[in-house]
Protein backbone atom coordinates (compact mmCIF):
# COMPACT_ATOMS: atom_id res chain seq x y z
CA UNK A 1 0.00 0.00 0.00
CA UNK A 2 1.34 3.40 -0.99
CA UNK A 3 1.78 5.78 1.91
CA UNK A 4 0.93 9.43 1.32
CA UNK A 5 3.23 11.57 3.41
CA UNK A 6 2.19 15.01 4.58
CA UNK A 7 4.42 18.02 4.90
CA UNK A 8 2.06 19.82 7.25
CA UNK A 9 3.74 20.83 10.46
CA UNK A 10 1.11 20.46 13.15
CA UNK A 11 3.33 22.40 15.56
CA UNK A 12 3.73 25.46 13.36
CA UNK A 13 2.11 28.81 14.25
CA UNK A 14 0.26 28.75 10.91
CA UNK A 15 -1.31 25.37 11.70
CA UNK A 16 -2.32 26.53 15.18
CA UNK A 17 -3.92 29.69 13.76
CA UNK A 18 -5.82 27.74 11.10
CA UNK A 19 -6.99 25.20 13.65
CA UNK A 20 -8.24 27.93 15.97
CA UNK A 21 -10.07 29.66 13.12
CA UNK A 22 -11.72 26.43 11.98
CA UNK A 23 -12.68 25.49 15.54
CA UNK A 24 -14.36 28.88 15.94
CA UNK A 25 -16.31 28.38 12.71
CA UNK A 26 -17.42 24.89 13.77
CA UNK A 27 -18.52 26.24 17.16
CA UNK A 28 -20.51 28.98 15.40
CA UNK A 29 -22.16 26.35 13.20
CA UNK A 30 -23.12 24.22 16.20
CA UNK A 31 -24.56 27.28 17.94
CA UNK A 32 -26.59 28.16 14.84
CA UNK A 33 -27.90 24.60 14.46
CA UNK A 34 -28.91 24.54 18.12
CA UNK A 35 -30.87 27.75 17.56
CA UNK A 36 -32.52 26.29 14.45
CA UNK A 37 -33.62 23.26 16.48
CA UNK A 38 -35.58 25.61 18.74
CA UNK A 39 -37.99 26.24 15.88
CA UNK A 40 -40.22 29.24 16.48
CA UNK A 41 -38.77 29.86 19.93
CA UNK A 42 -39.65 29.02 23.52
CA UNK A 43 -42.98 30.85 23.57
CA UNK A 44 -44.23 29.23 20.37
CA UNK A 45 -43.06 25.81 21.52
CA UNK A 46 -44.78 26.22 24.89
CA UNK A 47 -48.03 27.17 23.17
CA UNK A 48 -47.68 24.17 20.86
CA UNK A 49 -47.03 21.63 23.62
CA UNK A 50 -49.78 23.09 25.83
CA UNK A 51 -52.23 21.76 23.24
CA UNK A 52 -51.00 18.24 23.86
CA UNK A 53 -48.90 18.19 20.70
CA UNK A 54 -45.33 16.99 20.28
CA UNK A 55 -42.66 19.14 18.67
CA UNK A 56 -41.62 18.00 15.17
CA UNK A 57 -38.29 16.49 16.15
CA UNK A 58 -39.92 14.67 19.05
CA UNK A 59 -42.51 13.31 16.65
CA UNK A 60 -39.75 11.98 14.43
CA UNK A 61 -37.94 10.44 17.40
CA UNK A 62 -41.13 8.61 18.38
CA UNK A 63 -41.47 7.28 14.85
CA UNK A 64 -37.91 6.07 14.32
CA UNK A 65 -36.70 2.62 15.32
CA UNK A 66 -35.14 2.88 18.81
CA UNK A 67 -31.46 3.78 18.67
CA UNK A 68 -31.44 4.34 14.90
CA UNK A 69 -29.92 7.39 13.23
CA UNK A 70 -31.69 10.26 11.50
CA UNK A 71 -29.91 11.99 8.61
CA UNK A 72 -31.40 15.48 8.51
CA UNK A 73 -31.24 17.55 5.34
CA UNK A 74 -31.65 21.27 4.78
CA UNK A 75 -31.21 22.34 8.40
CA UNK A 76 -30.14 25.82 7.34
CA UNK A 77 -32.75 26.29 4.63
CA UNK A 78 -34.14 29.86 4.57
CA UNK A 79 -31.47 31.08 6.99
CA UNK A 80 -31.31 34.89 6.80
CA UNK A 81 -33.26 34.92 3.54
CA UNK A 82 -36.58 36.58 4.34
CA UNK A 83 -35.69 39.27 6.84
CA UNK A 84 -37.51 37.28 9.51
CA UNK A 85 -36.66 34.04 11.28
CA UNK A 86 -37.90 30.95 9.43
CA UNK A 87 -35.77 28.21 11.07
CA UNK A 88 -35.15 25.23 8.78
CA UNK A 89 -37.74 26.78 6.43
CA UNK A 90 -40.43 25.65 8.87
CA UNK A 91 -39.99 21.92 8.21
CA UNK A 92 -37.76 19.09 9.41
CA UNK A 93 -36.74 16.60 6.72
CA UNK A 94 -34.42 13.63 6.65
CA UNK A 95 -33.90 9.91 6.25
CA UNK A 96 -34.59 7.52 9.11
CA UNK A 97 -35.42 3.87 9.73
CA UNK A 98 -39.00 2.88 10.57
CA UNK A 99 -39.77 -0.81 11.14
CA UNK A 100 -36.41 -1.61 9.56
CA UNK A 101 -37.22 0.38 6.39
CA UNK A 102 -35.26 3.48 5.38
CA UNK A 103 -37.81 6.26 4.86
CA UNK A 104 -37.88 9.91 3.91
CA UNK A 105 -39.61 11.77 6.73
CA UNK A 106 -40.86 15.34 6.46
CA UNK A 107 -42.46 17.07 9.45
CA UNK A 108 -43.99 20.54 9.33
CA UNK A 109 -42.99 22.74 12.27
CA UNK A 110 -46.16 24.53 13.36
CA UNK A 111 -44.13 26.67 15.78
CA UNK A 112 -42.63 28.43 12.75
CA UNK A 113 -45.28 30.64 11.11
CA UNK A 114 -47.93 28.00 11.69
CA UNK A 115 -46.06 25.49 9.54
CA UNK A 116 -46.86 27.55 6.45
CA UNK A 117 -44.91 27.13 3.23
CA UNK A 118 -42.44 29.82 2.22
CA UNK A 119 -40.84 29.51 -1.23
CA UNK A 120 -37.83 27.73 0.28
CA UNK A 121 -40.09 25.43 2.28
CA UNK A 122 -41.47 24.29 -1.06
CA UNK A 123 -37.94 23.80 -2.44
CA UNK A 124 -36.95 21.80 0.64
CA UNK A 125 -40.04 19.60 0.39
CA UNK A 126 -39.39 18.99 -3.31
CA UNK A 127 -35.74 18.17 -2.64
CA UNK A 128 -36.77 15.60 -0.04
CA UNK A 129 -39.17 14.04 -2.54
CA UNK A 130 -36.48 13.95 -5.23
CA UNK A 131 -34.14 12.05 -2.90
CA UNK A 132 -36.98 9.69 -2.00
CA UNK A 133 -37.86 9.03 -5.64
CA UNK A 134 -34.27 8.45 -6.75
CA UNK A 135 -33.67 6.01 -3.88
CA UNK A 136 -37.19 4.54 -3.73
CA UNK A 137 -37.67 5.56 -0.10
CA UNK A 138 -41.18 5.45 1.36
CA UNK A 139 -42.33 8.96 2.29
CA UNK A 140 -43.85 9.77 5.67
CA UNK A 141 -45.36 13.24 5.98
CA UNK A 142 -46.07 14.47 9.52
CA UNK A 143 -48.51 17.19 8.54
CA UNK A 144 -49.25 20.24 10.70
CA UNK A 145 -49.44 23.11 8.24
CA UNK A 146 -51.42 26.19 7.36
CA UNK A 147 -50.56 25.76 3.67
CA UNK A 148 -48.90 28.46 1.59
CA UNK A 149 -47.61 31.51 3.43
CA UNK A 150 -50.20 34.10 2.40
CA UNK A 151 -47.93 37.18 2.21
CA UNK A 152 -45.69 35.19 -0.17
CA UNK A 153 -48.24 33.10 -2.01
CA UNK A 154 -47.31 34.87 -5.25
CA UNK A 155 -43.83 33.35 -4.85
CA UNK A 156 -44.74 29.74 -4.10
CA UNK A 157 -46.59 29.11 -7.38
CA UNK A 158 -44.89 30.89 -10.34
CA UNK A 159 -42.23 28.29 -11.05
CA UNK A 160 -41.98 25.02 -12.92
CA UNK A 161 -41.38 23.32 -9.59
CA UNK A 162 -43.96 25.24 -7.60
CA UNK A 163 -46.12 24.31 -4.59
CA UNK A 164 -48.38 22.10 -6.68
CA UNK A 165 -45.41 19.99 -7.80
CA UNK A 166 -45.40 18.46 -4.30
CA UNK A 167 -48.71 16.75 -5.04
CA UNK A 168 -47.61 15.87 -8.57
CA UNK A 169 -44.65 14.05 -7.02
CA UNK A 170 -46.87 12.24 -4.54
CA UNK A 171 -49.10 10.93 -7.31
CA UNK A 172 -46.18 9.80 -9.44
CA UNK A 173 -44.30 8.12 -6.59
CA UNK A 174 -47.49 6.33 -5.59
CA UNK A 175 -47.81 5.08 -9.18
CA UNK A 176 -44.19 3.89 -8.96
CA UNK A 177 -45.03 1.83 -5.88
CA UNK A 178 -43.22 4.15 -3.45
CA UNK A 179 -45.50 4.38 -0.39
CA UNK A 180 -46.88 7.82 0.48
CA UNK A 181 -48.04 7.93 4.11
CA UNK A 182 -49.41 11.01 5.87
CA UNK A 183 -50.03 11.54 9.56
CA UNK A 184 -52.22 14.56 10.28
CA UNK A 185 -50.98 16.06 13.53
CA UNK A 186 -52.97 19.29 13.72
CA UNK A 187 -54.91 21.78 11.66
CA UNK A 188 -54.12 21.31 7.96
CA UNK A 189 -55.55 24.10 5.88
CA UNK A 190 -55.57 24.88 2.15
CA UNK A 191 -52.34 23.56 0.60
CA UNK A 192 -51.59 21.65 3.79
CA UNK A 193 -54.75 19.60 3.23
CA UNK A 194 -53.62 18.17 -0.10
CA UNK A 195 -50.70 16.16 1.32
CA UNK A 196 -52.89 13.71 3.31
CA UNK A 197 -55.52 13.79 0.56
CA UNK A 198 -52.94 12.61 -2.01
CA UNK A 199 -51.33 10.01 0.26
CA UNK A 200 -51.83 6.26 -0.07
CA UNK A 201 -52.61 6.08 3.63
CA UNK A 202 -53.68 8.89 5.98
CA UNK A 203 -53.60 8.64 9.76
CA UNK A 204 -55.34 11.35 11.79
CA UNK A 205 -54.70 12.03 15.46
CA UNK A 206 -57.95 12.06 17.41
CA UNK A 207 -59.00 15.46 18.81
CA UNK A 208 -56.08 17.20 17.08
CA UNK A 209 -56.30 16.54 13.36
CA UNK A 210 -58.40 18.61 10.98
CA UNK A 211 -58.29 18.89 7.20
CA UNK A 212 -60.03 21.61 5.23
CA UNK A 213 -59.42 23.83 2.25
CA UNK A 214 -61.21 26.74 3.91
CA UNK A 215 -61.43 26.74 7.70
CA UNK A 216 -63.98 28.40 10.01
CA UNK A 217 -62.50 31.94 9.70
CA UNK A 218 -62.76 31.91 5.92
CA UNK A 219 -66.20 30.32 5.98
CA UNK A 220 -67.37 33.08 8.31
CA UNK A 221 -65.89 35.88 6.18
CA UNK A 222 -66.97 34.44 2.81
CA UNK A 223 -70.49 33.16 3.44
CA UNK A 224 -71.28 34.50 6.91
CA UNK A 225 -71.63 31.06 8.48
CA UNK A 226 -70.03 30.31 11.85
CA UNK A 227 -68.96 26.68 12.15
CA UNK A 228 -66.66 24.68 14.37
CA UNK A 229 -63.40 23.21 13.07
CA UNK A 230 -64.68 19.78 14.07
CA UNK A 231 -67.72 20.20 11.84
CA UNK A 232 -65.79 21.36 8.79
CA UNK A 233 -62.79 19.11 8.87
CA UNK A 234 -62.47 16.79 11.86
CA UNK A 235 -61.47 13.20 11.22
CA UNK A 236 -64.92 11.65 11.73
CA UNK A 237 -66.27 13.67 8.82
CA UNK A 238 -63.30 13.18 6.51
CA UNK A 239 -63.17 9.45 7.20
CA UNK A 240 -66.57 8.96 5.57
CA UNK A 241 -65.00 9.72 2.20
CA UNK A 242 -61.38 8.64 2.55
CA UNK A 243 -59.18 5.84 3.84
CA UNK A 244 -58.06 7.18 7.21
CA UNK A 245 -56.98 5.56 10.44
CA UNK A 246 -57.78 7.01 13.84
CA UNK A 247 -54.71 7.47 16.04
CA UNK A 248 -55.35 8.22 19.70
CA UNK A 249 -51.80 9.35 20.48
CA UNK A 250 -48.93 9.82 18.08
CA UNK A 251 -46.32 7.44 19.62
CA UNK A 252 -48.81 4.59 19.24
CA UNK A 253 -49.72 5.42 15.63
CA UNK A 254 -49.46 2.56 13.20
CA UNK A 255 -45.78 2.34 12.43
CA UNK A 256 -46.52 -0.98 10.79
CA UNK A 257 -48.14 0.87 7.89
CA UNK A 258 -44.64 1.48 6.57
CA UNK A 259 -43.71 -2.17 6.80
CA UNK A 260 -46.96 -3.30 5.18
CA UNK A 261 -46.58 -1.00 2.20
CA UNK A 262 -42.80 -1.06 1.66
Language model feature labels by segment:
Residues 1-187, 191-194, 198-214, 228, ...:
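Terminal-region recognition feature
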Residues 219:
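N-terminal cationic and glycine-rich segments that engage phosphates or anionic surfaces
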Residues 222-262:
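N-terminal low-complexity segments that are often proline-rich with Ser/Thr-Pro
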